[in-house]
Every structure is written in C-alpha cells, then in structure tokens.
C-alpha cells in the first residue's frame, strides 16, 4: 500500500504515518494540495491519499478526476468534528478518520 499524506507531518498526523508504516505501508508526505498533485503527476503514485480536513479537499478531488488520476481520498482531522466529517464526505472523500489515530482504524483503511 502506498499512502500519500497531505498535511503538516506533526502531532497526530505523524502518529498516523507511523502506524501506517508499522502496517507495511510506504508513506510519503506533502503539505499542500499543489504539492500532492505535483507528486501524483510525477513518478509518485498512491493507492490512498489521506488529507487534512483543513485543506482544499474538493479541489484535490476535482483535479484528480480531471487528470484521470485514480486513487482513494480519505480525510482526517483532530477530534470527532461531525461537521468537518460531513464537509469532507460532501467534497468527495470516501471516509473521515478522526485523530488521534486508532491503530485498528488505520489498519482497516489500509486494507
């Protein structure tokens, strides 16, 4: 599994990356949607993109669709903010992962 994390790699996001690596995922990271798109356009591919809910999820997903880049997008955010989860799903994310990360939840998403 190749995981691209689109967020600042700190705190709970860093913890989620570590859990994913423990489960065998190859993890890469960018901080912005533009950086993520550039990476995906280049030689880097990802089976799963995990993006911070504070970033432009809808722009990422629209760009992926327009450029015919096929990958699953999952949003993540601190706590159980129901409104943030709804916005992320409405923007096109397949799931919302609350942070701090739960090892079993990370494992389920990677499967």
Where are each of the predicted segments found?
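Short amphipathic alpha-helix used as the core "switch/output" element in two-component signaling
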Residues: 56-70
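Receiver (REC) domain switch/output surface
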Residues: 106-111
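A Lys-centered signature of the CheY-like receiver
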Residues: 99
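Two-component/phosphorelay signaling modules centered on CheY-like receiver
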Residues: 8-31, 35
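A short, hydrophobic beta-strand element within the central beta-sheet of small alpha/beta folds
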Residues: 4, 49, 70-81
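Alpha4-beta5-alpha5 "output face"
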Residues: 65, 86-90
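Acidic, metal-coordinating helix/loop segments flanking the phosphotransfer/catalytic sites
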Residues: 31-48
């Amino acid at each position: 599994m190749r995981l691209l994390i689109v967020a600042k790699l700190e705190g709970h996001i860093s913890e989620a990356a570590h859990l994913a690596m423990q489960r065998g995922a190859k993890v890469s990271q960018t901080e912005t949607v533009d950086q993520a798109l550039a990476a995906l356009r280049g030689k880097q591919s990802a089976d799963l993109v995990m993006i911070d809910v504070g970033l432009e999820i809808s722009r990422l997903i629209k760009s992926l669709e327009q450029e015919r880049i096929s990958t699953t997008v999952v949003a993540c955010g601190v706590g159980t903010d129901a409104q943030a989860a709804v916005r992320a799903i409405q923007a096109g994310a397949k799931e919302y992962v609350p942070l701090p990360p739960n090892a079993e939840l990370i494992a389920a998403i990677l499967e």
